[in-house]
Swiss-Prot record:
This is Pescadillo homolog. CDD domains: BRCT_pescadillo_like (cd17709). PANTHER family: PESCADILLO - RELATED, PESCADILLO HOMOLOG. The keyword Acetylation does not apply. GO terms for biological process: maturation of 5.8S rRNA from tricistronic rRNA transcript (SSU-rRNA, 5.8S rRNA, LSU-rRNA); maturation of LSU-rRNA from tricistronic rRNA transcript (SSU-rRNA, 5.8S rRNA, LSU-rRNA). Component of the NOP7 complex, composed of erb1, nop7 and ytm1. The complex is held together by erb1, which interacts with nop7 via its N-terminal domain and with ytm1 via a high-affinity interaction between the seven-bladed beta-propeller domains of the 2 proteins. The NOP7 complex associates with the 66S pre-ribosome. Belongs to the pescadillo family. InterPro entries: BRCT_dom (IPR001357), BRCT_dom_sf (IPR036420), PES (IPR010613). It comes from the Eukaryota. Keywords: Coiled coil, Nucleus, Ribosome biogenesis, rRNA processing. Residues 496-521, 534-546, 554-586 have a biased composition (Acidic residues). Its main location: nucleus. Residues 522-533, 587-597, 630-640 have a biased composition (Basic and acidic residues). It comes from Aspergillus oryzae (strain ATCC 42149 / RIB 40).
Length: 681
């Protein structure tokens, strides 16, 4: 006889464990259990049957894998948590005795330090794994870098997040790894490519943040502890691959003055000593060269001139080989039936030097931090701003002639409303000349900040006149959403997106609406006049009423007349079939009548009949489109009859989604059409 299997020893009851059982098994508190799970990357699971997994009738809410909890039993951090618990008991005992100094000494000298280095190595065995998990880390650290310091968010945490984020930005600037950016309601999205991995993160706008009390900052602080360690490892590895010393030199005084990115100085690993040695050899060689006679120097110059032609040829050959090696690779399919890959149209080096030849000046109202980061990431070396925005600028003088582009984010105002010229900040030779706000310096291009984002997303310099101060900006679209067929594209014109006959139908509908409004207005006037006449008649005929206010039944003659009217109204199906021909004959008659009237008046017929011809063309075009659409629907229905039920259902779903998309696009096009016509008026 087979042994009876005991309940709860296999299946879901064995594979899952509740949170209460896990806390008891690990012998730690619930907050420490949460921190440990966040550090180790263990998350709650959802069993198929909660009652079977809980081994009782009461369904628990949180479950974990039993193997995960068994894995946590060997974690070295458990000992740190237990030491912290024992230390807290000692501190509480000292405070109970009134020994405050002993409690402070215990907390200062015996507090266990948590190190997460081994957890980073366990969770990310390769560097590519760490890069793939960097999106959430960057988003959270940039968020904490812009938060105000409170009791829940200490200043040390904010300073650490700011330092790590600026170090990561410096790597992107040096390597030109930033690819795209997008301004959204939530914040600014960035995308960078590091070692073939696309990393996207969100940076909030620098508004005044109001910290709410419903946010659990203890959980977020745990994630910050883990992500700061992760980003520190990643920055060290990235700097090491470039041969840079990590951490970079940080100027605290400059950072206090608002330098931000300029407060960091990148240094090569053991490069400074070599440069000094080279400089020393240059100095010794320069002193030795003084002793060389002029005759020897003249002979050397002759040799260089004689070999100049061959040298230029060699240089040209080297440049040609370099240009040939720097060409963009073409992805050709291996077989004719293979998929065709998208061909790159621009290289990373070309995109990284997009703003290299320009000198930018950021006005006070423009966001300095994101603009400086993007401009430096795309090759710009000379960026100036007002001294109010902080240190680290190429120039603080707005009248500097080297400035080629100025970023302005204020509306164009008349000269009378502009404020007076502010006083200079310094006196003497180093005084910075102030410019009246709103003035334009000749020889300089003025643009709005959106021009920077649209240029880097397109990979080329766009027309600056479309982004001039006070101009209506083009639509700023996400670079990660590509336009699909049938969807509305705000960058394209209406003529490119409209379907066949859509514009004529819309114009006809607008004319009908305007005619209806005019008819309603005239009918309203007629109704008011009739109401006044009827009121006067009622007042006159009140005494002459014969029926005494009672309804009188109709006679037989009235019934016969009503039947004859009904028969006259229904003309049969032949009349409906011949309605189109009668309409054409009527329109021809009216047109001939208008020609005669125009001839009698001595006017050309084209001016008097332009409106009628346009309406006739529009109505005929609408009829053609409707008939064509009806034929296509009939043909589609015939094709659907030959399909199986499964394919027919799938086709109906596809048609439904396409119809919804086309209806939404039609609504947006009609809205845009009305706005454009309103702007023309």
């Amino acid at each position: 006889m087979a042994k009876i299997k005991k309940k709860g020893t296999s299946g879901q009851a064995k594979n899952y464990i509740t949170r209460t059982q896990a806390v008891r098994k690990l012998q730690i508190s619930l907050p420490d259990f949460r921190r440990l799970c966040i550090f180790k990357g263990i998350y709650p699971r959802e069993p198929r049957n909660k009652k079977k997994a809980a081994k009782n009738s009461t369904a628990s809410t949180t479950f974990y894998y039993t193997k995960d909890i068994q894995y946590l039993l060997h974690e070295p951090l458990l000992r740190k948590f237990r030491d912290q618990k024992a230390l807290s008991k000692k501190i509480a005992r000292s405070l109970g005795r009134g020994e405050v100094s002993d409690a402070a000494r215990l907390e200062k000298n015996h507090a266990p330090q948590l190190t997460l280095d081994h957890i980073i190595k366990e969770r990310y065995p390769t560097f590519i794994d760490a890069l793939r998990d960097l999106d959430d880390a960057l988003s959270l650290l940039f968020l904490f870098a812009n938060l105000p310091s409170t009791a829940h968010v200490p200043p040390k945490t904010i300073a650490l997040c700011q330092r790590l984020c600026h170090e990561f930005q410096h790597y992107l600037i040096v390597t030109n790894s930033l690819r795209k950016s997008f301004l959204s309601i939530k914040g600014i999205y960035y995308q960078a490519t590091i070692q073939g991995q696309d990393i996207m993160w969100l940076v909030p706008y620098r508004f005044v943040q109001r910290v709410n009390g419903d946010v659990d900052y203890r959980i977020m602080a745990t994630f910050v502890d883990f992500y700061t360690t992760l980003l520190g490892f990643v920055n060290f590895r990235l700097y090491s691959t470039l041969g840079l010393r990590y951490p970079p030199k940080f100027d605290t005084r400059s950072d206090e003055n608002g330098a931000e990115l300029a407060a960091f100085t990148l240094e090569g690993r053991a490069v400074g000593e070599t440069t000094k040695a080279i400089e020393g050899t240059k100095q010794t060689s320069s002193t030795a060269n003084k002793e060389v006679s002029q005759d020897v120097q003249a002979k050397v110059d002759k040799v260089i001139k004689s070999a100049g032609l061959d040298q230029t040829k060699d240089d040209q050959a080297v440049q040609a080989t370099e240009e040939s090696t720097e060409e963009i690779d073409k992805f050709e399919p291996a077989a004719p039936e293979a998929d065709t890959l998208l061909q790159p149209d621009i290289s990373g080096d070309t995109a990284g030097a997009l703003f290299a030849p320009f000198t930018f000046y950021i006005s006070r109202e423009a966001p300095k931090a994101p603009l400086e980061f993007i401009l430096r990431s795309f090759g710009c070396k000379r960026i100036g701003w007002d001294a109010v925005l902080g240190d680290g600028a190429f120039t603080h003088d707005e009248t500097d002639t080297r400035i080629t582009h100025q970023i302005v984010d204020r509306p164009a105002l008349p000269e009378s409303s502009l404020p007076a010229v502010p006083a200079a900040s310094e006196n003497g030779a180093g005084a910075v000349q102030k410019v009246k706000p709103g003035t334009r310096i000749p020889g300089r291009t003025y643009i709005q900040p959106q021009w920077i984002w649209d240029c880097i997303n397109e990979g080329k310099l766009l027309r600056p006149d479309l982004y001039a101060p006070g101009a209506t900006l083009p639509p700023h679209l996400s670079p990660w959403v590509k336009p699909t067929r049938g969807a509305y594209d705000p960058r394209a014109s209406l003529a490119e997106q409209e379907e066949e006959g859509e514009a004529e139908i819309a114009a006809e509908e607008e004319e009908e609406d305007s005619d209806e409004e005019m008819e309603e207005a005239t009918d309203g006037k007629k109704v008011d006049a009739k109401a006044e006449d009827s009121a006067e008649e009622e007042n006159e005929d009140e005494d002459d009423s014969v029926d005494g206010g009672m309804d009188v039944a109709g006679t037989d003659d009235d019934e016969d007349e009503s039947e004859e009217e009904m028969e006259d109204e229904f003309g049969g199906f032949e009349e409906e079939a011949a309605s189109e021909s009668e309409d054409e004959e009527e329109s021809a008659r009216t047109q001939h009548q208008k020609e005669l009237e125009a001839e009698a008046a001595g006017l050309p017929f084209s001016s008097s009949s332009a409106g009628g011809d346009s309406t006739k063309k529009k109505s005929s075009q609408a009829k053609k489109v409707a008939s064509k659409k009806r034929k296509e629907e009939e043909e589609l229905e015939r094709q659907k009859m030959m399909m199986s039920r499964k394919k027919r259902k799938l086709l109906e779903k596809m048609m439904y989604s396409n119809k919804k998309q086309s209806e939404e696009a039609a609504k947006l096009r009609s809205k845009r059409r009305k706005l454009e016509k309103g702007a023309e008026k």
